[in-house]
Structures are given as structure tokens and as C-alpha cells.
């Protein structure tokens, strides 16, 4: 039998439905792959083999009874940000040591309702703060990709680095992830996988550990566009427990795969041609434009004049919200507690020991920009810029543009513990330069592999869509995928 872990979700679904394989066989194949590779890749922080086998057994029973759900028997990895009832949920932070929620996040509950199987919890940047998966309390994740002729370990991107690496290394059929400033799309681009950040409000945030509440959005990382569409259909829903979730019908995203894009208008924003952008990224962008033109799309130049202010505005708004959200972690009711001489001393010692360096940095930035003397100068101004960024997109879409094409990242994956980036946080933050505008405007964005660079590492293209028009992104991304082909790393782990 061929390696079952190589099956896409769509292929596995067909084989399960035809009873050519069982959910238990498929799950066991992934558990075996995790046992063999996780010590090297470090994608999983918690593995749940007993739970997975029990869920798979129940899936087989439902398939036999003709009651299969949309994801029946499909083994998935869950980012450690999603609350999973009775299963360690730590946001990869020391401060949440030992926390086992008594609740299930809405997104994961939706997946289990559709028959999916949980393999375990995936590594990530601590509290989703990072672009390289190096801020995790559990240590960095290794990208399954390596440069040609090199043994250097590369980052998988962040914050959903565990999700992207697990999908690329065949350690799950698909994964949940979250995106606050690019945390789905950037790791997808770095690992040759597909990741979609849906419109803000498309997926419930209930039960997901908060980073920046007005920016966070859950979405899937998958091996191809069709699989991403299948997963998002199950993840998305309105939720009365999350007032920011939107009560709109969830389309059959998979039905949009293969549809023609003839006559569609694709916008190309000149502001995304940033200083110092590598020639390979520009060439990839031009190749993407050519593919869409060949498929019958009309290419139009557009302007998004406030793009250059997006990154500084994001790094004011996101830390401000994070400093408020993370104030709740004090060691009183759950997680880490470091004893002190009194309650204030206990708070201080717990937070000092529990939060990592990058999280502390962002809490301090957030507290500073919200302080009385700086609120107007920084936070209020950043929110005004955010409104202008959103307006730029609205004007482009009002002018008839159906989707916008940009690069997903300014480079391919870089090395773990890169000294240049470690010494300068701003250089690390620049990894988000093409992605943060989408979060600031609350729009959907998808990253799809476009090719390999001169080192043999994957590069991604990004498509940005109108609010709640993920269908257009899926059908357009599928055109790129068909033209570019699919990419998989050579196994070294």
C-alpha cells in the first residue's frame, strides 16, 4: 500500500468513503510518522494517540453506518492556541504550564462535529507573537525544506510554524492555524503549503487564546487549495459566543475550485514594490501575473497609498491589544505560579518567569502606546491609519477589482537563530510587510506556492479578496496552483 500520509484530504476522503482504507489505518499512519519525525521537526508539543485512535474508531463506525461527516476520519493537527477540552493548551508559553481547558474552541468543535480526528497540538510562537516559530517555550520548529546542498536548519515561519511544518512533512493531513499579521500566510509561503486567512468574523474566535482581538482570525493550512477549501468550510460558522463572528451562510468553497477566472479583474498594487525587494520575488510576482493573464483575467494597476504605514501602525495596534489581553495571566487560577512574599510580588514573579522575551517586549510596547501621555500620539493615530488602509482597499474593489495579487513574503525561509534578525527585532517584523495590511483591513488573504528560488526553497504568492469572498480567492489560487505545480521537500528528517 502507498504511504497513506501522502494522500491529500480530498484523496483520503474518497478512499475512506469507498472503504478502501479505514480511519484507524490512516490515523495510525500519521501517528507512526509523528513518532519517527517529531523529535527532529518539533512540530507537535502534545501528541494524543489514544484520543486519535478512539476518534478514528468512531469515524469508521459512522462510515459503516452511512453517517459520515464532511471530514470523517481525516487526521488533523491543532495549533496550541485553540482550546481543546482536557488536552494541554499552552499557547506555547511557560505561563500556561499545565492548563487543560474544560471547554472546546468553536472551530475545533466544528471540526470534530464533521468527523475529523485530532492527532495533537502544534508548536507555535509564544502567544502567536513571532514570524519564525523561535519564541516558543518548546523551542523552534525546523522547516522540512532545506536549501540545495545545505544542512542548515531553516525556520518554517510563524506564528503557525508547527502547523505549516507538520503539513509539509506529512505529519497531519491538514492543520488549524491563526493569523494576526500574517501567521498563516507567511509560514505557508515558507513551507510550500497553502494557507488562507479568512475575512475577520468568518471563523469564531471563541476558545482561541487571544493575541490582538480585532486582528486575530482562524484559518487552515493544507497541502493544496482544494484541501484548504474543504477545511475552511468546516471551520467557519457564526457563533453566538463570539459577537465578532458574522451571521452569513458558509459557501461550499470546494465548488469554486476549477471555475474559470476569465474576465476577472486582478489588481497589482505598485506600493508592494518595496525597496530592497529581491529580484526573485519580483520575477515570481510577474510570473503570477502572466499565469492569471493566460487564464483570461484582466490585469490592472492599482494604488494602495497607505500601505507604507501598515507595518508601523500594526506594531502599535497589535501590542496595545496584546498588553490588555495578557494582563489576565497572573498565576492565580491556572498555569504557572511563582510564590512571592505577597500577592503583588507573586504576580510580578509569575509574569517575569512565565512570559518570554518577545512577549514581554510587545506587552511593554502596548502598555507604552496606551499610556496617558502617548495614547493620542501613537494608538489613536495608528487607528486612523488603519481606517485609511481599509479605505484604500474599498476604493480598489469599488473600481471593479475582484482580487489583488502580491508576493506573500519578501524572501524565502531564513536560518534558525539568524544573528542579523535576532539582534534587530524590526528586521524580523519586516517579514510581515506584505501580509499585515490584510489584517488591518479585515480582508481575506490566501498564500499559494508559486515556485522555488535559486536555493530550491519555496516562494509564495498572495491573493487578497473582498470581504467574505473567499470563493474568488480559492478559484484564483487554484489557477496559480495548476500553473505552478505542487512542491514537496526532499525527506532528510
Curated annotation (Swiss-Prot):
Gene Ontology CC annotation, any one? glutamyl-tRNA(Gln) amidotransferase complex
Q: Does the keyword Protein biosynthesis apply?
A: yes
Name the source's superkingdom.
Bacteria
Q: Which residues form a coiled coil?
A: none
Q: Give the Gene Ontology MF terms in alphabetical order.
A: ATP binding; glutaminyl-tRNA synthase (glutamine-hydrolyzing) activity
For the protein in the UniProt heading, the enzyme class is ligase
- E.C. code: 6.3.5.7
Q: Which residues form the active site?
A: 79 (charge relay system), 159 (charge relay system), 183 (acyl-ester intermediate)
Which InterPro entries does the UniProt record give?
Amidase, Amidase_CS, Amidase_dom, AS_sf, GatA
GO BP term, pick one: translation
Keywords in alphabetical order, please: ATP-binding, Ligase, Nucleotide-binding, Protein biosynthesis
What reaction is this protein's catalytic activity?
A: L-glutamyl-tRNA(Gln) + L-glutamine + ATP + H2O = L-glutaminyl-tRNA(Gln) + L-glutamate + ADP + phosphate + H(+)
Q: Which family does it belong to?
A: Belongs to the amidase family. GatA subfamily.
Job of this protein: Allows the formation of correctly charged Gln-tRNA(Gln) through the transamidation of misacylated Glu-tRNA(Gln) in organisms which lack glutaminyl-tRNA synthetase. The reaction takes place in the presence of glutamine and ATP through an activated gamma-phospho-Glu-tRNA(Gln).
Give the record's subunit note: Heterotrimer of A, B and C subunits.
- Name of the featured protein: Glutamyl-tRNA(Gln) amidotransferase subunit A
Organism, by scientific name, is Sinorhizobium fredii (strain NBRC 101917 / NGR234)
Q: Give the source lineage, highest ranks first.
A: Bacteria, Pseudomonadati, Pseudomonadota, Alphaproteobacteria, Hyphomicrobiales
Tell me the name of the encoding gene.
Answer: gatA
Amino acid at each position: 500500500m502507498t504511504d497513506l500520509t501522502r494522500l491529500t484530504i480530498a484523496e483520503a476522503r474518497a478512499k475512506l468513503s469507498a472503504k478502501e482504507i479505514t480511519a484507524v489505518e490512516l490515523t495510525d499512519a500519521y501517528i507512526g510518522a509523528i513518532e519517527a519525525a517529531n523529535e527532529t521537526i518539533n512540530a507537535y508539543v502534545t501528541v494524543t494517540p489514544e484520543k486519535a485512535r478512539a476518534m478514528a474508531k468512531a469515524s469508521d463506525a459512522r462510515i459503516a453506518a452511512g453517517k459520515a461527516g464532511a471530514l470523517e476520519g481525516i487526521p488533523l493537527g491543532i495549533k496550541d492556541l485553540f482550546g481543546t477540552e482536557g488536552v494541554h493548551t499552552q499557547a506555547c508559553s511557560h505561563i500556561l504550564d499545565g492548563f487543560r481547558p474544560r471547554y472546546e474552541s468553536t472551530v475545533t468543535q466544528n471540526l470534530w462535529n464533521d468527523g475529523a480526528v485530532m492527532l495533537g497540538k502544534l508548536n507555535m510562537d509564544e502567544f502567536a507573537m513571532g514570524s519564525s516559530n523561535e519564541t516558543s517555550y518548546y523551542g523552534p520548529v525546523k522547516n522540512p525544506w532545506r536549501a540545495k546542498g545545505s544542512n542548515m536548519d531553516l525556520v518554517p515561519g510563524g506564528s503557525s510554524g508547527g502547523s505549516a511544518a507538520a503539513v509539509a512533512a506529512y505529519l497531519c493531513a491538514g492543520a488549524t492555524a491563526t493569523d494576526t499579521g500574517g501567521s498563516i500566510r507567511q509560514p505557508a509561503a515558507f513551507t510550500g503549503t497553502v494557507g488562507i486567512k479568512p475575512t475577520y468574523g468568518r471563523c469564531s474566535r471563541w476558545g482561541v487564546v487571544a493575541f490582538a482581538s480585532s486582528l486575530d482570525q482562524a484559518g487552515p493550512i493544507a497541502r493544496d487549495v482544494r484541501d484548504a477549501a474543504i477545511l475552511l468550510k468546516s471551520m467557519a460558522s457564526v457563533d453566538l459566543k463570539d459577537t465578532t463572528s458574522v451571521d452569513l451562510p458558509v459557501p461550499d468553497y470546494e465548488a469554486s475550485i476549477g471555475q474559470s477566472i476569465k474576465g476577472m479583474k486582478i489588481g497589482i498594487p505598485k506600493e508592494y514594490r518595496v525597496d530592497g525587494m529581491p529580484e526573485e520575488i519580483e520575477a515570481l510576482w510577474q510570473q503570477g501575473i502572466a499565469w492569471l493573464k493566460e487564464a483570461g483575467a484582466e490585469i490592472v494597476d492599482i494604488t494602495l497609498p497607505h500601505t507604507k504605514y501598515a507595518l508601523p501602525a500594526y506594531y502599535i495596534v497589535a501590542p496595545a491589544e496584546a498588553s490588555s489581553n495578557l494582563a489576565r495571566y497572573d498565576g492565580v487560577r491556572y498555569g504557572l505560579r511563582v510564590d512571592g512574599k505577597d500577592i503583588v510580588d507573586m504576580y510580578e514573579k509569575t509574569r517575569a518567569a512565565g512570559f518570554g522575551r518577545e512577549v514581554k517586549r510587545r506587552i511593554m510596547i502596548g502598555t507604552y502606546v496606551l499610556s496617558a501621555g502617548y495614547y493620542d500620539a501613537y494608538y489613536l493615530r495608528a487607528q486612523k491609519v488603519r481606517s485609511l488602509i481599509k479605505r484604500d482597499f474599498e476604493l480598489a474593489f469599488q473600481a471593479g477589482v475582484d482580487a489583488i495579487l502580491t508576493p506573500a513574503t519578501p524572501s524565502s525561509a531564513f536560518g534558525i537563530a539568524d544573528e542579523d534578525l535576532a539582534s534587530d527585532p524590526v528586521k524580523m517584523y519586516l517579514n510581515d510587510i506584505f501580509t499585515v495590511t490584510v489584517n488591518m483591513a479585515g480582508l481575506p488573504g490566501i498564500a499559494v506556492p508559486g515556485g522555488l528560488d535559486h536555493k530550491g526553497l519555496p516562494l509564495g504568492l498572495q491573493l487578497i479578496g473582498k470581504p467574505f469572498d473567499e470563493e474568488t480567492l480559492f478559484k484564483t489560487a487554484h489557477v496559480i496552483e495548476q500553473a505552478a505545480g505542487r512542491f514537496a521537500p526532499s525527506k532528510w528528517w
